[in-house]
Amino acid sequence: MDSNTVSSFQVDCFLWHVRKQVVDQELGDAPFLDRLRRDQKSLRGRGSTLGLNIEAATRVGKQIVERILKEESDEALKMTMASAPASRYLTDMTIEELSRNWFMLMPKQKVEGPLCIRIDQAIMDKNIMLKANFSVIFDRLETLILLRAFTEEGAIVGEISPLPSLPGHTIEDVKNAIGVLIGGLEWNDNTVRVSKNLQRFAWRSSNENGRHPLTPKQKR
């Protein structure tokens, strides 16, 4: 096992612990809490894959971070912060829409790269809007937190979510998954639209519906 893979996991575990303390002291906002929950699932998956105990990894991660901070000068920290690009968090969904449980009458699930796509195939002849919460950097989608498909009545009929066991995804992964979701919904004569945020940062298209033409694979 690569030593850098292990040390990266250990540091991530400790930093997650620090962020959890921030939430416990009620200092974190909704996007901060969303990322914390998503990263918790990711760490569990990575720990299982690596065969490492999260509690033990957190202790070692603390030692690594403390050693780095001891060697870090204030001036170097200022320069690092000034040069690092800042990401933005965009929210199409409310906390209620993001956390709501939903059920499928005719469930279909497909894995597309590091993303899981779920569609209720019982939904027909509906107007559907895709909404997502995600971060943006350099004017492009950085990390998808969650994407959901809503009917005009507010029912959830589809979803795209990152797989905890496969952390990390690209904008192309997200585009492909959106194409599969749209294709599955349109198969049952539903009309699908994409939110303005998704159109701008993740689904850049040239047609009048704000979408790329779907490939035969995505239409299935």
From Swiss-Prot:
The main location is host cell
Q: Which InterPro entries match?
A: NS1 (IPR004208), NS1A (IPR000256), NS1A_effect_dom-like_sf (IPR038064), uS15_NS1_RNA-bd_sf (IPR009068)
Q: Where does the motif Nuclear export signal lie?
A: 137-146
Which key words are in the record?
A: Eukaryotic host gene expression shutoff by virus, Host cytoplasm, Host gene expression shutoff by virus, Host mRNA suppression by virus, Host nucleus, Host-virus interaction, Inhibition of host innate immune response by virus, Inhibition of host interferon signaling pathway by virus, Inhibition of host PKR by virus, Inhibition of host pre-mRNA processing by virus, Inhibition of host RIG-I by virus, Inhibition of host RLR pathway by virus, Interferon antiviral system evasion, RNA-binding, Ubl conjugation, Viral immunoevasion
The protein's location, in the record's own words, is: Host nucleus; Host cytoplasm
> What family name appears in the similarity comment?
Belongs to the influenza A viruses NS1 family.
Record PTM text: Upon interferon induction, ISGylated via host HERC5; this results in the impairment of NS1 interaction with RNA targets due to its inability to form homodimers and to interact with host EIF2AK2/PKR.
- What Gene3D superfamilies does this protein's entry cite? Influenza virus non-structural protein, effector domain, S15/NS1, RNA-binding
- Region: RNA-binding and homodimerization; residue ranges are 1-73
GO cellular component annotations of the record? host cell cytoplasm; host cell nucleus
Q: Which GO terms describe its biological process?
A: symbiont-mediated suppression of host cytoplasmic pattern recognition receptor signaling pathway via inhibition of RIG-I activity; symbiont-mediated suppression of host gene expression; symbiont-mediated suppression of host mRNA processing; symbiont-mediated suppression of host PKR/eIFalpha signaling; symbiont-mediated suppression of host type I interferon-mediated signaling pathway
Query: Domain comment text?
Result: The dsRNA-binding region is required for suppression of RNA silencing.
Q: How does it assemble?
A: Homodimer. Interacts with host TRIM25 (via coiled coil); this interaction specifically inhibits TRIM25 multimerization and TRIM25-mediated RIGI CARD ubiquitination. Interacts with human EIF2AK2/PKR, CPSF4, IVNS1ABP and PABPN1.
Region entry CPSF4-binding: which residue ranges?
180-215
**What name does this protein carry?**
Non-structural protein 1
